[in-house]
Amino acid sequence: MSRTLARCTIAFMASLLATPVFADDRGGYVTVIAGLANQSDQTLDFRNGSTATRGEGAFDSGILGGGAVGYRFDNGWRVEGEFVYQSVDHNGLVLPSGGPSGSGNYASTSVAVNGLYEFDILGSPRARTYVGAGLVYLTEVDIDFEVGSSEQSYSGTGTGIQLLAGARYDIGERWFLDAGLRYLAASSLDLEGEAGAPGQIKADYEPWAATVGVGWRF
């Protein structure tokens, strides 16, 4: 995680030296996004009383959907609040010593406040590239394990940070398209068993996603 954050931070700082976009189109906007979410393998720590064990989780791709409301200033900066749901699948995890097993998903809902900076590297008056970062509150993180008709779920809340980069293209005076990449990092989340599921799981949550969206300025 630290290496990924370091690389993204360097890229963010370098982008601030690029040519800014200071067009006089300040004002509010709304954006709706959808995308393909992914997550690298994670270590899951399972605890049940005095019993503790560890397992490795391998995750497949999944989906992301959400929206944001923001305001763009006339100096290249904008700020926004967003809500996002994302989920990735796993084909089967086994946590020994009485831990859960089976296939399922690893999902979250979150709200965030993002700060973003726009600059011009595409040379088009209609296009704006951007980078940014956000503070994230995970209103729920949930991992499910399904075997047949039986399901065990573990959930919790947490905080994290996210890094964003992308581009926007105007398709009219108010409408625009958006394409971007995002990475979220939340460490050592405590996920409690639900509905009689035994024990607790401690895990990192580090999804990344490629997104497309459409927005409207007001």
Residue ranges and their predicted role:
Residues 66-72, 166-170:
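Short, conserved structural micro-motifs that define repeat-unit consensus positions
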Residues 24-27, 34-40, 68-146, 205-218:
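Gram-negative (and chloroplast) outer-membrane scaffold detector with strong preference
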Residues 37-65, 154-159:
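Surface-exposed strand-loop-strand hairpins of Gram-negative outer-membrane beta-barrel proteins
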Residues 1-27:
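Cleavable N-terminal export/targeting peptides
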Residues 62-65, 108-112, 158-162, 176, ...:
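Transmembrane beta-barrel architecture of outer-membrane proteins
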Residues 43, 83, 87-92, 163, ...:
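Predominantly the C-terminal beta-signal and adjacent terminal strand-loop region
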